[in-house]
């Protein structure tokens, strides 16, 4: 067998996508529902765990135990203002565990708490399985993408999520960089080009400026808004229709979670329709207190409802241009990424800002990031195809990195947007006479004072020989590797004594043991999911068999061919089984199978005798199909809402 391909995963806030590079091109892989993007949702019920479409589809029925937006929690502390403000909007509960946020849900009748890494790992496991189902062999190697402004601990935590999902994470790369790679393949050999990537997704907005020169990518600047995306546009529509419902029916549905959730689903659908049509209609039966809600909305009205949000997308564009020290006339290409860039008004605003420049939308905006990640995965696996041969990837540090010097001043060694991997060294000295040691405190951020920046870690270099202030020479080196992991070393030049810290943000990070434990738990949950699937198919098989038998003996065409006694025997037994099923929906697989054997012992002799007697064309048809029941015919889908 050829060596297995590596995959690229776009782990999104609201949706995720997976791709693979094979036979010289990228394939974006559809899930079992036929969708090329999968909701980043995980749901827990009394009987099972659902991931992706299945989880999102039942959210109206089970909002407290359906988890999404794990990407907004990952790598953050519980006390982080972002976490505190986001928590107010989520229907699921977030609890504090040693200043780490955990999501608390009820699963199989027990209260369980999961780290964001675990929730994300479940989504990653789903993406891995989607790829495996398509490729037909196990997949372990993957490139996973993160937003450009993710800091060190968020990157690390994402990597941990990959490990828990059983992946070997080849590299974590920036989403815009991935989109640029997707874009760069068809753009080699044109001299240096400045590309602006405008990524408006389901929950977040990112602007990045890259320079591409002969297959080499360099990220010049990044900007964005972590809380702007398709969901905000949905919210505007929801609020609009809640008000309309009040006007029309004098009732407020906003406190009824299920009604709002059904309305939101309809709004999301309407929004998508409005990207291609100028009008969309909503029809929701019995939305609230038995009232059917039938209404419509025009594209113009939708644009007006969201006009301030749409306009606000241009501010980060201006900021990125300033950071990259480029004028808008110097941008050669504009690339659209993220489903929300399909909105005509958003495209028009961007196009007008760049004085009518053409937008590049040849890549499906939902898939561009996974596309690039798949290419990058192929490169890292040593793919020799000429399409990827000449591509080299330079990434950047999203925030300045430095240390605290006298008076709480932030002294940056690695400036924001520096190309990584990179290494910077600077000499520092002591602040007071005979100072025995120095405390090296490492920060990330753009503010002048360290108190306004984010402390990544600290360590001490002790044993400095007594000397007047300003005499000792302490050499500090900041070294970032290709994954954005930071090593800081301090060396006393006189003694050669050194100390170092690797910032994978240990305070915010999971320990090796915790990751191990989570890997095992992930396996356990996966096994439980399998058991649950088998159980359900055994139940369905029994149910179909019972109903098939019942309808067989009640068939008008069999009158006179079966004795009333036999008929009663079969019907009574079927009825007994059907009643037992209603009372024991949660029985185990072998109980269902045992019941089925019991039922077969009663039915088979009668049915076989019946058909041998009848001898008709139907003889084999029914007996052959029935014992299979539901199990052979694939999963059955129950409609929700």
UniProtKB/Swiss-Prot annotation:
Keyword tags? Acetylation, ATP-binding, Chaperone, Cytoplasm, Cytoskeleton, Methylation, Nucleotide-binding, Nucleus, Phosphoprotein, Stress response
Which residues does UniProt call coiled coil? none
Spans of biased composition, class Gly residues?
A: 617-633
Q: Which residues cross the membrane?
A: none
* Chain positions recorded as ATP binding sites: 12-15, 71, 202-204, 268-275, 339-342
Provide the residue span(s) of the region labelled Substrate-binding domain (SBD). Answer: 394-509
Quote the PTM field: In response to cellular stress, acetylated at Lys-77 by NA110 and then gradually deacetylated by HDAC4 at later stages. Acetylation enhances its chaperone activity and also determines whether it will function as a chaperone for protein refolding or degradation by controlling its binding to co-chaperones HOPX and STUB1. The acetylated form and the non-acetylated form bind to HOPX and STUB1 respectively. Acetylation also protects cells against various types of cellular stress.
Gene Ontology biological process terms in this record:
chaperone cofactor-dependent protein refolding; positive regulation of microtubule nucleation; positive regulation of proteasomal ubiquitin-dependent protein catabolic process; protein refolding; regulation of mitotic spindle assembly
Q: Which CDD domains match?
A: ASKHA_NBD_HSP70_HSPA1
Instruction: Mark the residues carrying the PTM N6,N6,N6-trimethyllysine.
Output: 561
Sites bearing Omega-N-methylarginine, chain numbering: 469
Record-listed N-acetylalanine modification sites? 2
This protein's record includes keyword Protein biosynthesis:
no
Q: Name one GO cellular component term.
A: plasma membrane
Location within or outside the cell: Cytoplasm; Nucleus; Cytoplasm, Cytoskeleton, Microtubule organizing center, Centrosome
Chain spans, region Nucleotide-binding domain (NBD): 2-386
Gene Ontology MF annotations: ATP binding; ATP hydrolysis activity; ATP-dependent protein folding chaperone; heat shock protein binding; protein folding chaperone
Which PROSITE patterns did the record assign? HSP70_1, HSP70_2, HSP70_3
- Function comment: Molecular chaperone implicated in a wide variety of cellular processes, including protection of the proteome from stress, folding and transport of newly synthesized polypeptides, activation of proteolysis of misfolded proteins and the formation and dissociation of protein complexes. Plays a pivotal role in the protein quality control system, ensuring the correct folding of proteins, the re-folding of misfolded proteins and controlling the targeting of proteins for subsequent degradation. This is achieved through cycles of ATP binding, ATP hydrolysis and ADP release, mediated by co-chaperones.
What domain notes does the record hold? Answer: The N-terminal nucleotide binding domain (NBD) (also known as the ATPase domain) is responsible for binding and hydrolyzing ATP. The C-terminal substrate-binding domain (SBD) (also known as peptide-binding domain) binds to the client/substrate proteins. The two domains are allosterically coupled so that, when ATP is bound to the NBD, the SBD binds relatively weakly to clients. When ADP is bound in the NBD, a conformational change enhances the affinity of the SBD for client proteins.
Q: Which family does it belong to?
A: Belongs to the heat shock protein 70 family.
Quote the subunit structure annotation. Component of the CatSper complex. Identified in a IGF2BP1-dependent mRNP granule complex containing untranslated mRNAs. Interacts with CHCHD3, DNAJC7, IRAK1BP1, PPP5C and TSC2. Interacts with TERT; the interaction occurs in the absence of the RNA component, TERC, and dissociates once the TERT complex has formed. Interacts with TRIM5 (via B30.2/SPRY domain). Interacts with PRKN. Interacts with FOXP3. Interacts with DNAJC9 (via J domain). Interacts with NAA10, HSP40, HSP90 and HDAC4. The acetylated form and the non-acetylated form interact with HOPX and STUB1 respectively.
Q: Which PANTHER family match?
A: HEAT SHOCK PROTEIN 70KDA
Task: Provide the protein name.
Answer: Heat shock 70 kDa protein 1
